[in-house]
Swiss-Prot record:
Location of the region described as Disordered in the Swiss-Prot/TrEMBL record: 1-36, 385-405, 533-554
Source organism (scientific name): Danio rerio (Zebrafish)
GO cellular component: centrosome; cytoplasm
Keywords, comma-separated and alphabetical: Coiled coil, Cytoplasm, Cytoskeleton, Neurogenesis, Transport
Name recorded for this polypeptide: BICD family-like cargo adapter 1
Coiled-coil region: 102-283, 458-520
Length: 569
């Protein structure tokens, strides 16, 4: 549109000379041709503009004024006036044409400038439009690529959804078929479950009878366990009493050791003094002491022979005796070093009494273990050796026949432990069987409940459900009772009895081991004592014997309460 406008403006209609003549001719001013031409000049598209029209109007006005002025001045005289007028008219036309040309040139320059400016603006706008067109084309291509990718993705999604739709339709068809088949199977299972309910009621009755029998068995076992607990308490009391005795003996032995140490210190001091006195008085009293020393040597030889016989007798006696004192070898060694042989004999008698008491206690423990084992095995008749209580008060010769055989107490303890473990395993197995039966019945009941939820329940099914709920409640009660029974059985503290018996067995073994140690200590003490007597000089026997006799006498007097404790026990 702008180009067409510029073409029209750049090519304005320019009147030729004829038109200009007709327009500037005053004679033809009022003619219709001139008027049409003037109108064409005024109405022509893209004409001279408002300035040109104003100039034309001014020129025409000036011409009319001159004609009006020249008319009265010069008379009209034929052809001269016409020529003059024509001449003047032509001059005026030339002036007018020059002015019009000048105006047209100026107008043309303005129009060219406007045209150049407009063409420049047009070119700039065309470049911007081309750039925008290129950008829009690039965006269009990118959008077309995006839309093509999106369309491809949507097509793949549509295909995928179509596949899923077909698969879901197939699954729905399969589900419908399975539903119809399950309905038929459930109807058949309903009939079977009704039959199983009747069988479950019979099984429940059998379980109730078994529970009653188990309850009776548990009552019997609880009674026997109470008896075992009382026996355990008695054994624990005996163990506590023995531990107290042991502590008292240890305290007394410590006191005896201290006294023995003090006596040994005094003996050493006396030895040092006697040696000094012997050195000072050796030369002075040598003649007086010789006959006395000979007599003392003879007496010592006789005493030595007697003591040798007594020591041999004591060695044989100690090898036969079974002393079970719980003391360290060092304590006995220190005591035996300062005590006399008579005191040793008295002590052996006390030890024999204590040994007999320990044997009796071990025998009672062995009898109790055997009786418990027989009760656990279900034997109401005990052994003849266990039922005879009169044999406990017989002499030491009959008691020695009743010594517990080696390993029998340990074997009986192992048997007792095995029987208790079997009892617990049996109870656990019964509980496991009952729990399995209860779980199976519970699964059947859950299956029945699911069936009743699927199908419309009738009166028979509702009554069966009520019976099932009652059976579940009863089974839960039975499970609770069985759990309580299991807890009570496990709470029987059989380990305490076994530990007490094992402790007594260990004590007896320690006493037997101590017996051998005591034999060796006594032999060593006697041998050392005799060797010292033979090694000492002859003149020191009398005073040393007198000095040693006094401490031993004091020690024997102080140790009387210690061994009276064994007699009381």
């Amino acid at each position: 549109m702008s180009a067409s406008c510029l073409d029209l403006i750049s090519a304005p209609p320019q009147p030729d000379s004829d038109r200009m003549d007709r327009a500037l001719n005053p004679g033809r001013q009022n003619s219709p041709d001139t008027a049409g031409e003037l109108t064409l000049l005024h109405t022509a598209p893209g004409g001279l503009g408002m300035a040109l029209e104003e100039e034309l109007a001014m020129l025409t006005g000036d011409r009319e004024d001159e004609l009006q002025e020249s008319a009265p001045e010069t008379p009209v005289s034929g052809q001269d006036s016409d020529l003059l007028s024509l001449f003047r008219q032509k001059e005026k036309d030339l002036v007018l044409a020059a002015k019009l040309g000048k105006a047209l040139l100026e107008r043309n320059q303005d129009l060219t400038k406007q045209y150049d400016k407009m063409t420049k603006d047009l070119n700039d706008r065309l470049e911007l439009l081309e750039q925008e067109k290129h950008e829009l084309r690039r965006r269009l291509e990118s959008r077309e690529g995006e839309w093509e990718g999106r369309v491809a993705e949507l097509e793949t999604d549509v295909q995928h959804l179509q596949g899923e739709l077909e698969r879901h339709q197939l699954q729905l068809r399969d589900a419908d078929r399975e539903k119809s088949r399950a309905i038929s199977e459930l109807s058949e299972q309903n009939h079977r479950l009704l039959e199983q309910l009747s069988r479950a009621a019979e099984v429940e009755k059998q379980l109730s009878t078994q529970v009653h029998s188990l309850r009776d068995d548990f009552k019997e076992k609880s009674i026997s366990s109470n008896q075992h607990m009382t026996r355990l308490e008695t054994l624990q009391a005996e163990i506590r009493m023995l531990s107290e005795r042991k502590q008292d003996l240890e305290r007394r032995v410590c006191a005896v050791l201290e006294e023995n140490q003090q006596l040994q210190n005094t003996v050493e001091e006396l030895r040092e003094r006697t040696l000094e006195l012997e050195k000072h008085c050796h030369h002075k009293d040598l003649q007086k002491i010789l006959p006395e020393t000979l007599l003392t040597i003879i007496k010592l030889k006789t005493n030595y022979s007697q003591k040798k016989k007594k020591t041999e007798h004591l060695i044989l006696h100690t090898r036969r005796a079974h002393t079970h004192l719980c003391r360290a070898p060092s304590e006995v060694q220190s005591c035996m070093g300062s005590l006399s042989c008579v005191w040793c004999i008295q002590r052996r008698k006390d030890c024999d009494l204590f040994l007999l008491q320990l044997r009796l206690q071990l025998w009672e423990a062995y009898c109790q273990v055997r009786s418990i084992c027989s009760q656990l095995r279900g034997n109401d008749i005990t052994d003849s050796a266990l039922s005879t209580d009169s044999s406990m008060d017989e002499s030491s010769e009959t008691l020695s026949a009743k010594d517990v055989p080696t390993g029998s107490l340990h074997s009986s303890l192992l048997e007792l432990r095995r029987l208790t473990q079997n009892l617990l395993d049996g109870n656990e197995s019964t509980v496991a069987l009952l729990s399995v039966e209860v779980s199976s019945s519970r699964e059947e009941n859950e299956r029945l409940r699911a069936m009743t939820e699927v199908h419309e329940p009738n009166e028979q099914l509702q009554s069966a459900i009520r019976d099932r709920d009652e059976a579940i409640a009863k089974k839960k009660a039975v499970e609770m009772e069985l759990a309580k029974c299991k807890i009570d059985i496990m709470s029987l503290n059989s380990b305490q009895l076994l530990d007490a018996i094992q402790q007594k067995l260990n004590l007896s073994q320690q006493l037997e081991a101590w017996q051998d140690d005591m034999h060796r200590v006594i032999d060593q003490q006697l041998m050392d004592k005799h060797q010292e007597e033979w090694k000492d000089p002859p003149f020191s026997f009398s005073r040393r014997g007198a000095a040693a006799s006094r401490p031993t006498q004091r020690l024997a007097d102080r140790d009387k309460p210690l061994f009276s404790f064994f007699k009381k026990n």
